[in-house]
Swiss-Prot record:
Transmembrane segments: none annotated. It comes from Plasmodium berghei (strain Anka). Disruption phenotype: In the mosquito midgut, male gametocyte exflagellation is normal; however, the rupture of the host erythrocyte cell membrane is delayed. Fertilization is normal, however zygote development into ookinetes is arrested at the retort stage where ookinetes are still immotile. In arrested ookinetes, protein levels, but not mRNA levels, of a subset of proteins including MyoA and MTIP, two components of the motor complex, CTRP and SOAP are strongly reduced. The modification Phosphothreonine is found at T230. The modification Phosphoserine is found at S65, S117, S216, S219, S334. This is Calcium-dependent protein kinase 1. ATP binds at L63, G64, S65, G66, A67, Y68, G69, E70, V71, K86, K90. A motif (J domain autoinhibitory motif) lies at residues 345-352. InterPro entries: CDPK_Ser/Thr_kinases, EF-hand-dom_pair, EF_Hand_1_Ca_BS, EF_hand_dom, Kinase-like_dom_sf, Prot_kinase_dom, Protein_kinase_ATP_BS, Ser/Thr_kinase_AS.
Length: 523
């Protein structure tokens, strides 16, 4: 289940430190609050919940089961949206991965905490979203988004093989997720069609990478040595127990091969036969099965299935290959309205208020539905030219230029670069120099949808932990997980919305603050 070399389990039980300095990639800004800055990120909302899980969710049906437990489809009692809950037995662990001496179960539990810590840190449109964590004497409960489309594996069984456009759109999303993971020093180690889910059965354009139980943090100077993975997709260097993050690229190459011809490059009657072929690394493009497949596709497969991982392409290089660029979707004229609205909403957003930032990010990342996010998610992925799951200054400028090419909607905007700098200053909540997926969704979505009374009430209740009807600075410090921030800074944050100067924020003041940060009108 584990994430070796990961953050400590204490990060899961508490909250992630969000106190950063003002130095960042690509952008420099002045410190506020006497040099103190508070970074906002979606992971701060994922905490181990108190109480029984049955008080928050009720079971609809079982979705599946495995060695560690089962996955249930559940509904929220407050909000009624569907979630998938991974139920992990505390008494279960892979005895083959541990010695039989002491503290086996403790080690297993530590790895689960590490998996949770990893999932908290991820914010990408093609990676599973974690919402809540519960724990009792017998089980861990991981509450995630529910994807009704099933596994990519099922699509492969039903369709046998895919045309190059469909295959390219699938691979672009998988590689984008892997590229994002690798840039954050995370290796998945079990990429396979069973761990790729579809949001719905009618579209291949929104897939999710799931099951980070074998994932690990890595460093460039340290070779991974655990032999983990699934026979068809395991890289030869993993069998030798000396490898790096490029083992994920090999797995992607195997998936791409299967998508285009319907069978794996390394087959066999059993795992032992398959592994023998993987160890040799020899595969072929059968003429009859591959005669109508482009040379660009074969070239990319060869790059990803290069036996020597030192010579193998990276996920980013694969993502920017000729085949992906030729066959995968890009921004077109039909995207004009959504793109225009997204850029307009970012321009109008005033993100100086930290409490408002935290509230809008919570609503956008945790309370919106897949359907509500669909169009903006598609635009985000198309703007993300290098596929790393983040928008940088160059990509935002290109977005403006693309829109101008369609129609002179932004003719009054004279200095695009200056405008993009302002957008990054306002929308980059976590101060990393990029606009992350959840930041983009939260700021770009129509506020008439985002700011329903129910969602504003749920956001307010997130801060009002003692249910007193007022938000205090102590509650803010607890949510942000910061103990080193000065009292003056918290007073400033509270004062952003405290209209009656009672050193607390009631619901009416909270709503007023939220409506001030951006105009309701879309572009």
């Amino acid at each position: 289940m584990g994430c070796n070399q990961s953050k400590s389990a204490n990060d899961v039980r508490g909250n992630k430190v969000n106190h950063v300095n003002s130095k960042k990639k690509n952008n420099k800004r002045e410190d506020t609050n006497d040099g103190e800055e508070i970074a906002i990120n979606p992971g701060m909302y994922v905490r181990k919940k108190e109480g029984k899980i049955g008080e928050s969710y009720f079971k609809v049906r079982k979705l599946g089961s495995g060695a560690y437990g089962e996955v249930l489809l559940c509904k929220e009692k407050n909000g009624h949206s569907e979630k998938a809950i991974k139920v992990i037995k505390k008494s279960q662990f892979d005895k083959g991965r541990y010695s039989d001496d002491n503290k086996n179960i403790e080690k297993f539990h530590e790895e689960i905490y590490n998996e949770i810590s990893l999932l908290k840190s991820l914010d990408h449109p093609n990676i599973i979203k974690l919402f809540d964590v519960f724990e009792d004497k017998k089980y861990f409960y991981l509450v995630t988004e529910f994807y009704e489309g099933g596994e990519l594996f099922e699509q492969i069984i039903n369709r046998h093989k895919f045309d190059e456009c469909d295959a390219a759109n699938i691979m672009k999303q998988i590689l984008s997720g892997i590229c994002y993971l690798h840039k954050h020093n995370i290796v998945h180690r079990d990429i396979k069609p069973e761990n790729i889910l579809l949001e719905n059965k009618n579209s291949l354009l929104n897939i999710k990478i799931v099951d980070f139980g074998l994932s690990s943090f890595f460093s460039k100077d340290y070779k991974l040595r655990d032999r983990l993975g699934t026979a068809y997709y395991i890289a030869p260097e993993v069998l030798k127990k000396k490898y790096n993050e490029k083992c994920d690229v090999w797995s992607c190459g195997v998936i791409m091969y299967i998508l285009l011809c319907g069978y794996p490059p390394f087959g066999g009657q059993n795992d032992q036969d398959i592994i023998k072929k993987v160890e040799k690394g020899k595969y072929y493009f059968d003429f009859n099965d591959w005669k109508n497949i482009s040379d660009e596709a074969k070239e990319l497969i060869k790059l990803m299935l290069t036996y020597d991982y030192n010579k193998r392409c990276t996920a980013e290089e694969a993502l920017n290959s000729r085949w992906i660029k030729k066959y995968a979707n890009n921004i077109n004229k039909s995207d004009q309205k959504t793109l225009c609205g997204a850029l307009s909403n970012m321009r109008k957003f005033e993100g100086s208020q930290k409490l408002a930032q935290a509230a809008i990010l919570f609503i956008g990342s945790k309370l919106t539905t897949l359907e509500e996010r669909k169009e903006l998610t598609d635009i985000f992925k198309k703007l993300d030219k290098n596929g790393d799951g983040q928008l940088d200054k160059k990509e935002l400028i290109e977005g403006y230029n693309v829109l101008r090419n369609f129609k002179n909607e932004l003719g009054e905007l004279k200095n695009v670069e200056e405008e993009v700098d302002n957008i990054l200053k306002e929308v980059d909540f976590d101060k990393n120099g990029y606009i992350e997926y959840s930041e983009f969704i939260s700021v770009c979505m129509d506020k008439q949808i985002l700011f329903s009374e129910e969602r504003l009430r749920r956001a307010f209740n997130l801060f009002d932990t003692d249910k007193s009807g007022k938000i205090t600075k102590e509650e803010l410090a607890n949510l942000f997980g910061l103990t080193s921030i000065s009292e003056k800074t918290w007073n400033d944050v509270l004062g952003e919305a405290d209209q009656n100067k009672d050193n607390m924020i009631d619901f009416d003041e909270f709503v007023s603050m939220m409506h001030k940060i951006c105009d309701h009108k879309t572009f």
